[in-house]
Amino acid sequence: MIPWLSSDSLFPPLHTALIQPNGLLAVGGDLSPRRLIEAYSQGIFPWFNDGDPILWWSPDPRMVLFPRELKVSRSLQKSLRKGNYEIRTDRNFTPVMRACAAPRRDSCGTWIQNKMIFAYSALHEMGFAHSVETWMDGELVGGLYGVALGRVFFGESMFSRVSNASKIAFVHLVRQLERWGFEMIDCQMKTAHLASLGAREIPREEFSQRLKELVNYMERGEKWCFDHEQVE
């Protein structure tokens, strides 16, 4: 039976998560910064539709990318070499989330609701949630956002308005994280898109153990600035 969380409840052990649907661990609780940091540090993330209660997940296996295993296709390399774009970080976090929330061709809705945008924007103000943005001709054309704790980046969502724009942001993110000493990027669930970039599945138990070694709780994060950016 899936437990319902109150505002002060602890998450149940990961091994109690359901097999089907894969990884459903708990229901309820809140999206406060404290709760979200507690969740991510244990390998748990919220994912639910508008009108539903908050659902908390820890799937097995877990899709991850180790920065050294990044794969860049020839077509993506060509897009990167063009250099007709600018990468910015943490400049437009909430607009990136709203762009990720926009309906896609293959769906009419999104799980990124206003309450999620509000919650992650609060994490962003604390320096734990970050956006990586691809700009062309002064317009935001792609990007991604996620949560950084210790030496792990937890990817949440991506969007593209022009071909390869989100992948360009992702490649720059991975290369910068490797320079900063990050060792793992959480991609949550398997997709062909992520697999093409080098992500692979590992057992939840291994993922959990790696988190214990790599995630360090900090009272406050910091705004990101990639090596090529000018500090303002």
Curated annotation (Swiss-Prot):
Keyword Transmembrane in record: no
GO CC annotations on file: cytoplasm
GO biological process: protein catabolic process
GO molecular function: leucyl-tRNA--protein transferase activity
EC number: 2.3.2.6
Reactions it catalyzes: N-terminal L-lysyl-[protein] + L-leucyl-tRNA(Leu) = N-terminal L-leucyl-L-lysyl-[protein] + tRNA(Leu) + H(+); N-terminal L-arginyl-[protein] + L-leucyl-tRNA(Leu) = N-terminal L-leucyl-L-arginyl-[protein] + tRNA(Leu) + H(+); L-phenylalanyl-tRNA(Phe) + an N-terminal L-alpha-aminoacyl-[protein] = an N-terminal L-phenylalanyl-L-alpha-aminoacyl-[protein] + tRNA(Phe)
Enzyme class: transferase
InterPro entries: Acyl_CoA_acyltransferase, Leu/Phe-tRNA_Trfase, Leu/Phe-tRNA_Trfase_C, Leu/Phe-tRNA_Trfase_N
Reported function: Functions in the N-end rule pathway of protein degradation where it conjugates Leu, Phe and, less efficiently, Met from aminoacyl-tRNAs to the N-termini of proteins containing an N-terminal arginine or lysine.
HAMAP family for the chain: Leu_Phe_trans (MF_00688)
Protein name: Leucyl/phenylalanyl-tRNA--protein transferase
Species this protein is from: Nitrosospira multiformis (strain ATCC 25196 / NCIMB 11849 / C 71)
